Amino acid sequence: MKKVRAIANIIIVAILVGLTVVAIPFTSSVRASVNPNVIYQGDTNNNKVSFMINVYWGTEYLEDMLDVFDLYQIKTTFFVGGSWVAKNVEMAQEIYKRGHEIGNHGYNHKDHDKITEQQNYDEIHKTHLLISANLGIEMNLFAPPSGAYNDTTVNVATGLGYRTIMWTHDTIDWRDKNTDLIIKRATKNLSNGDLILMHPTKHTLEALSAILAYAENNGFQPTTVSEVIGE
């Protein structure tokens, strides 16, 4: 891990100079929300950004990802699914012990815009209780699985004390197994207050050091979602 920073800088130069043609277009989900409880981007008046991690699978990559964040002395936000936590309590505790923020990602990775008000409540509240019991913390950030939500979802989340977190840029790393492409999507047009969506995958792990190095080398401060949105 000691050579990671130097290698990351080399990777950045090679990718950002050489990767001029991308088969799949860069995807950004920036859009204004009329609901103040749905957040797509944080405070654009400061240099903070968040490379947030959504977790339902990919447990085998998390330890190494945590090591990379430690190397750069960066804390971020992990939105964890309740069903994942139930099977991986020790790893969830390890993420929290390392100083990272924990967010609610529902319980069963359902499309929250397709379920009832009661089901929305159950998904969010059950996860809240599970994490509180095992980590001893309270949470106030909810990331709907697949970014699927409607007014009912937001109202339920708000009633439970949550703000609904979306993203500014989506790396689509769960689908596209391409390290260079993940780096490009995470860093292209990076701006103050951006929220970048990532997952624990093999190629995301390979890309992570280069992404963090790029952010720091370009004057950004990677941190937790709460820090970016000013909570």
At which residue positions do the language-model features occur?
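Terminal accessory/targeting
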Residues: M1-M52, D67-T76, S191-E231
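Active-site beta->alpha N-cap acidic-glycine motif
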Residues: S29-D111, I115, Q119, E123, ...
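Catalytic domains of cell-wall/extracellular-matrix polysaccharide-remodeling enzymes
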Residues: K110-E231
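A broad, low-specificity signal for short, low-complexity segments enriched in glycine/proline
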Residues: N9-I15, P36-Y40, D64-M65, G103, ...
